[in-house]
């Protein structure tokens, strides 16, 4: 009984209108009010951008790119080399030149 009532109330608008829903090319002729098509274009494009953004974020989370994979098993640092000497002796730095520069006295090298 409930199903029959639901179907009846769903079909009342179809019977009451003069539109032929089985002919979609004539469906816009049922309405006399002018439609602002640019609003529909903006709405549809905004909806497509939103849906594609949601789908792309869902796909990005599910795909295993190399920068998203679990990387704890990789070494963080290279293994230290055991054959390096612990005391590294650097050579003596060269002596400063014995010539005195003119610019050191006057401060004009800035």
Swiss-Prot record:
Predominant cellular place of this UniProt entry's protein: host cell
Which GO biological-process labels does this protein carry?
Answer: regulation of signal transduction
Q: What does the UniProt record tell us about how this protein is modified after translation?
A: Phosphorylated on serine; O-glycosylated, but not N-glycosylated.
Instruction: Check the record and name the InterPro entries matching this protein.
Output: Adeno_E3_14_5
Q: Where in the cell is it found?
A: Host membrane
Instruction: Classify the protein's membrane topology as the record does.
Output: Single-pass membrane protein
Keyword annotations of the record: Early protein, Glycoprotein, Host membrane, Membrane, Phosphoprotein, Signal, Transmembrane, Transmembrane helix
Q: Which Pfam families match?
A: Adeno_E3_14_5 (PF04834)
Question: Membrane-spanning residues where?
Answer: 37-57
User: Which is a Gene Ontology cellular component entry for this protein?
Assistant: membrane
Signal peptide range in chain numbering: 1-16
Instruction: State the protein's purpose.
Output: Down-regulates the EGF receptor and prevents cytolysis by TNF.
Protein family according to the UniProt entry: Belongs to the adenoviridae E3_14 family.
This protein is called Early E3B 12.7 kDa protein
Native species: Human adenovirus A serotype 12 (HAdV-12)
């Amino acid at each position: 009984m409930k199903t029959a009532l639901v179907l009846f109330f769903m079909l009342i608008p179809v019977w009451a209108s003069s539109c032929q829903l089985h002919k979609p090319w004539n469906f816009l002729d049922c309405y006399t009010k002018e439609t602002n098509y640019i609003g529909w274009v903006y709405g549809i494009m905004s909806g497509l951008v939103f849906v594609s953004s949601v789908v792309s974020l869902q796909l990005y989370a599910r795909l295993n790119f190399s920068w998203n994979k679990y990387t704890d098993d990789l070494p963080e640092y290279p293994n230290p080399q055991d054959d390096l000497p612990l005391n590294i002796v650097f050579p003596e730095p060269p002596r400063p030149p014995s010539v005195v520069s003119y610019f050191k006295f006057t401060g004009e090298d800035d």
